From Swiss-Prot:
Homodimer. GO terms for molecular function: 3-isopropylmalate dehydrogenase activity; magnesium ion binding; NAD binding. Substrate binds at R97, R107, R135, D220. The record marks Y142, K188 as: Important for catalysis. Its cofactor is Mg(2+); Mn(2+). This is 3-isopropylmalate dehydrogenase. Its EC number is 1.1.1.85. It holds the Pfam family Iso_dh. It comes from Wolinella succinogenes (strain ATCC 29543 / DSM 1740 / CCUG 13145 / JCM 31913 / LMG 7466 / NCTC 11488 / FDC 602W) (Vibrio succinogenes). The gene is leuB. PROSITE patterns: IDH_IMDH. The keyword Amino-acid biosynthesis applies.
């Protein structure tokens, strides 16, 4: 039987609750699909600051580098917001991405038919939406130098090199080849020099993928078009800052940020996480939606472990659970036949994934 080592980072807030449900689903499905998972827990975020004095202990980095993949919950909270930047939970995640040489973030947005009323947009606008945002993750303005403060002035620098743009472009075009073969590259080339280089480089790389249709869009127009006509998009390729914004905007097409997973890939180990935050205001209440984390576990099986059939089983179990009317509190107003706790939702999906609930 195949064996895989998974690094587990539960993090802060609802992180431990939702990661436990993802593990429950993975455990329910692994044996029947011929593989075994072993988990190793590590600290990151606010809990790491409290226990180890830093947001990312060296032990966590080393453990993640040894693992076949990393499954992560969420970090952060008001408790740590006043700390110096280098001690805030978010700095730990940025450092981990850099340590793992991760450079590409994949964020799918799929509108489930069963939850179409959850969106604030009309059914005619969002029905059938299936978008993948490919975001460059370790370059751009979040990491560019120089940055800092001088008296009453503060500054950051947006920097991209040709190799950085080339490698993220390849990720987007390869993803498009498995989808509808359309890439929309989003930049601000009418204002920013760095975006002009981005557009030139992406256009050149596109020639290596003649089957893929490439279009370009300015970030302000893209933000508007994502609401006006989201079905025009297949794969959206963009930089770190713009991708951070667009992926959160796209998430609301589905009606709940608690539904959507993400994968951060390209380096020594891949990191899988829900796109929502740590939601400390509902932590410990048993009402958090675990679907995004369970879907992230499915992406882990698919992209890092090659267990495609198991991933398909989880995805189908999520759809079946929603079709049967099971809902957590955040989506309870839309077709709910039964309101579930976090634990109950995880158990239902686990049962369907293992074919116990058929």
């Amino acid at each position: 039987m195949k064996k895989y080592e998974i690094a587990i980072i539960k993090g802060d807030g609802i992180g431990p609750e939702i990661v436990d449900e993802a593990k429950k689903v993975l455990d329910a499905i692994s044996y029947s699909h011929g593989f075994e998972l072993s988990y190793h827990d590590y600290l990151m975020g606010g809990i790491a600051v409290d226990r180890a004095g830093v947001p990312l202990p060296d032990e966590t980095i080393e453990g993640c580098l040894r693992a076949d993949a990393v499954l992560f919950g969420a970090i952060g909270g008001e408790k740590w917001d006043s700390l110096p930047r280098e001690l805030r939970p978010e700095s730990g995640l940025l450092k981990l991405r850099k340590s793992l040489e991760i450079f590409a973030n994949l964020r799918p947005t799929v509108v489930y038919d069963e939850l179409i009323e959850a969106s604030t947009l009309k059914e005619s606008v969002i029905k059938g939406v299936d978008i993948l945002v490919v975001r460059e993750l370790i370059g751009g303005i979040y990491f560019g130098e120089p940055k800092g403060r001088e008296g009453d002035k503060a500054f950051n620098t947006m920097v991209y090199s040709v190799p950085e743009i080339e490698r993220i472009a390849h990720v987007a075009f390869k993803a498009a080849m498995r989808r509808q073969k359309r890439v929309c590259s989003v930049d601000k080339a009418n204002v920013l020099d760095v975006s002009q280089l981005w557009r030139e480089t992406v256009t050149r790389i596109a020639k290596e993928y003649p089957e893929v249709e490439l279009s370009h869009m300015y970030i302000d127009n893209a933000a508007m078009q994502l609401i006006r006509n989201p079905k025009q998009f297949d794969v959206i390729l963009t930089g770190n800052l713009f991708g951070d914004i667009l992926s959160d905007e796209a998430s609301m097409l589905s009606g709940s940020i608690g539904l959507l997973p993400s994968a951060s890939i390209g380096g020594k180990a891949a990191l899988y996480e829900p796109i929502h935050g740590s939601a400390p205001d509902i932590a410990g209440q048993g009402i958090a939606n675990p679907i995004a984390t369970i879907a992230s576990a499915s992406m882990m099986l698919r992209h890092s472990l090659g267990e495609v059939e198991a991933a398909d089983a989880i995805d189908k179990a999520i759809v079946k659970t929603l079709k049967e009317g099971y809902r957590t509190k955040d989506i309870a107003a839309f077709g709910a036949k039964e309101i579930c706790t976090t634990d109950e939702m995880g158990s239902i999906i686990a049962n369907y994934a293992a074919k116990k609930g058929e």
